[in-house]
Amino acid sequence: KMEKPNKFRDSVAEVILTFGGTDQHDLSRIVYERIKEICKKYQVFVRIVTGPGYRGFTHLEKMVSETSGVSLTHATGVISSIMESADIAITSNGRTVYELAHMNIPGIVIPQHEREETHSFAREQNGFIKMEPYVEGMSLEKVPILLENLIINNQFRYTLFSRLEKFCFLGNKQRLLDKIFEKCIDRK
C-alpha cells in the first residue's frame, strides 16, 4: 500500500520523533523530555519511532509507559504508514527527511554528526527547520521553542507544508532501474 501525502490540518494533533536506526545520542529520549510539556499544553500526541539499533529503548519504554499522550514503536521497517497521522516531525538529517518530504510533514531537523551536516536537503526552502549538529551535552532548549511556534503559528507551518507539496519520490526506484537498464542496452 502506497501512503498518500498528508493534507494540511489547521490544528496540530500529532508530532513524530524519529532519529534513525541507532540514535547514538539518545535524542529520542532527550528531545521527548524537552517537548513533553509543550505537547501536553497543546494536547499534541507524541509518537516516538526508534530503530533496531537503539540502545535506550528499555529506559524510554519505561518513561513512556508512565505517561499518556505518547506512544513508542520500535524497529518498524517502513515508517511512512506511521507518518500518515503526523503534523510535525522532529528527526535527524538522514533518509527519513525524504520520507517526511514525500508525506508533506514539516519538521525540525537535528543532524547527529558531521556527515549529516553535509546533507543539504533539509532547509526552510524545502519545509524543514535545520538546527546545528548535535554534540554531547547540547541543551536543545531551542527545540520546544521551535515546536511551540510550529504548533501555534499556522501560517508559518503552512508555508513549510506548502514547500513540501512539490516533492514526490514514488517513482524514484523505477527511474533508477530504467536508467541502469538503458546504460546496459547502450553498451551492447
What is the meaning of each model-derived region?
Residues 1-188:
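Nucleotide-activated sugar donor-binding and catalytic core shared by glycosyltransferases
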